[in-house]
Amino acid sequence: MKKNLIALAISSCLLLSACSDQSSTSSSTNTSNPAASIAPGAPGQSSLWAYAGKTGIGTSYEQYTNGAYSDAGASGTISKVWFSIAQGVLTETMYGLIHEAQLQELQFFIKSSDALDEEKRDTISTTSYLKTDAQGRPLSLAYKVVNKDKEGKYEIEKHFFTDPDSQSLMMRVIVRALTDTITPYAYVNPAIANTGSNDSAAYSNNSWTATDGNSSMTLKTSAAVVHSTLGFEGVSDGITELKQNGTLSNQYSTTGATKGNVAFTLQLPTLKQGETAQWDFVLGFGKNAAESSASADKTLATGYDKVLAHYNGDGDAIGWQDFLQKLPALEKLSATATDGGKLLYTSAMVLKAQEDKTHAGAFIASLSNPWGDTKSAEQSATGYKAVWPRDFYQVAMAMLALGDTESPRIAFEYLQQVQAGDKIKGYTGTPGWFLQKTHVDGEPEWVGVQLDQTGMPLMLGWRLWKDGILSDAEISGWYKKMLKPAADFLVNGGAVKIQWNDKTITPPYTQQERWEEQQGYSPSTIAATIAGLISAGDIATHAGDTESAKKYFSAADKYSAQLETLTYTTAGSLTGEQGNGNYYLRINANEDPNDHSALGTSNAQIISDESQVIDGGFLELVRYGVRSATDKHIAETLPEYDNQQLPDLLRVKYEFTFPGVEGTFPGWRRYGVDGYGEDQSNGLGYVEANNSTQGRGRVWPIFTGERGHYELQLAHQLQSKNGSNKVDIEKLRNTYIKAMELFANEGMMLPEQVWDGVGNNDAYQYQKGEGTNAATPLAWTHAEYVKLLRSYSDGKVWDRNASTEARYVK
């Protein structure tokens, strides 16, 4: 790999007679301007985030030191920089805490003899990995992106990775002029301190720096920059001038005392037809301009080869290969995959990459802002770069499935930071439940009570104890300080008061179910509640608290006995050739599942009859061992759930085909009448609730995994009863595992949602089954895929709770 890259660099210099200087001391022709020229036009256009369908994310791998990230540990300096790639360009790049974006995008504009092209719109992009093994499996999150002009005039190749020894990102750029003379312009749109319109910008000494408060970003390059300017987006920035005048004449070097949505434009050397140029760009970060400049200088001085080798973990350096070598299940699970393990290796690293490095164990939902290119960046927002205990549980269990014993343990220990109690600022009320959504530092963001998010930490603690990762003494300690309050809340509920939420919770009635939208009795919520209580009962028994153990077991039994009475309709309005109107509801707002009562309006969708809405949450009852896969209530719900004759509004199941792949592959929406997705009238991003009734939630690959788990458990039970049937298991593997692999994009990122073919598709022209502009990669989806592989490899459902199964499945 190194030899090829060195050869490429040499050939680039030979092809371009004035090949750019690769040192960090390159000069720029615009440094001679003696007086600072202040850019007009503040604050510029309103700022937005970037397209959320990422084809790559990355950060440096760092080792824990005593359960934390420390500069004094084996990894040395902890690099707290994360990046993302979408539409062929660098998008949100974070520094500090994992949600603190500092960059909206960095892309190139190419001026040819007859046009000014925008890289992300006027090229065809491909994404691959810089380092793979002989089977093509990625060995690090270092990317190669090649963007080819749609008219064949030029090609831009870029390599992305971070510096493990600095707070910086490196991007190597190779530009090839194929059939025309071209001039590249680098365009940089900062979003310092996680907002897009409060930045100041300055140029000095070949450094382009943006600052907002205590955060700064500095761009440096080895390129001999011909001309540069800065300004306010859409008013005085360089690209706006190019579009208006065809040339860069302004030479603004500061925004002065005014702030806004700023952008840098760097004119690079012109390439004649047949010429190639290679340059390195570095984004450095810090608390001020001096720190960010020093970070960039350090990386440029270290150089491409050494930084990449360290990032990869080559030789003695600690990098991504070291992480992969710690996962003993990789080879076994690769044999179960249908792609040889490519998506598995990617998933393992993607899951690990979405952990904060200030608060070890804080795993977020996604390194993206859903529908970001339509979402305002005027105010700081985490998007999905936050902690949900439910998504968090999926990740921890997936890491455990990979054979990682460190990350799940540290994740479990982190959970005490997001548990309601006197440590949570502004909280008064009953302690024990886990906050709906928080920043990685524990700051509450959303504060609804979701009982499944309190059951899952109990399940995780139980599993870590049973697997020997937590000792008997340790689980007893955690029982007293974290698990007992959680279990008590699942039994007794109580008064909750934080921010807007002033409510008394009475389990198993939940204020919100797993889609965070409805209150009532939910099969999926009750499944996690029961499994959590059985886990708590086992732990309490071990800890010598027999009275509490009895209470937990008794409550679980009560909830199990009430389950069908509260959530199963025998008078449903969904019927078909096979359906008979008997099925689990998505949620029941009262104690009568047959009264056809209305549900609350959600995502602007009015649901006048709860029995019209079905989802796959009932399958969680089987996954966690609350019900048998052959239970008649489960079996009778499947026809309605799978009914593809329903109108699109109510329909949940869709089937997909992929070019060059034999067969059809199933997918499911969250539930009927789901409005969390693209606007059906124009194909644009999700519109906030009550603003549009045209939103449509699409198919989520998660549910292909959930169904694959159910089918495995069903096959296991039928095999136990009727004898072996290996052909059926192989068919399931080539249906559900393969489907999830096909839902991944070219960078092997698994999305939250894929296009289902319903509604206007003009905006993005998705192929059916292609990931949309919702959150990608979604940690939950990658976790579900990993767990599906582990389940099929083991021949039993990975998440299944043995104590729960022993109690309820006879």
Language-model segments: residues:
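C-terminal motif of bacterial Sec signal peptides marking the signal peptidase cleavage site
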Residues: 16-18
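An extended acidic
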Residues: 33-147, 217-243, 317-337, 343
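Acidic/polar, glycine-enriched structural segments that form the non-catalytic walls/loops
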Residues: 33-45, 152-155, 163-383, 472-473, ...
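C-terminal capping/lid segments that line or modulate ligand- or cofactor-binding pockets
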Residues: 34-94, 435-461, 599-600, 608-628, ...
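Well-ordered alpha-helical scaffold segments within catalytic/enzyme domains
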Residues: 175-176, 327-336, 349-354, 393-407, ...
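Aromatic-rich carbohydrate-recognition surfaces in CAZymes
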Residues: 176-178, 201, 210, 307, ...
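Extended ligand-binding clefts on enzyme/binding-domain cores
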Residues: 196, 210-242, 335, 339-343, ...
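Active-site acid/base region of carbohydrate-active enzymes
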Residues: 334-364, 413-435, 456-524, 547, ...
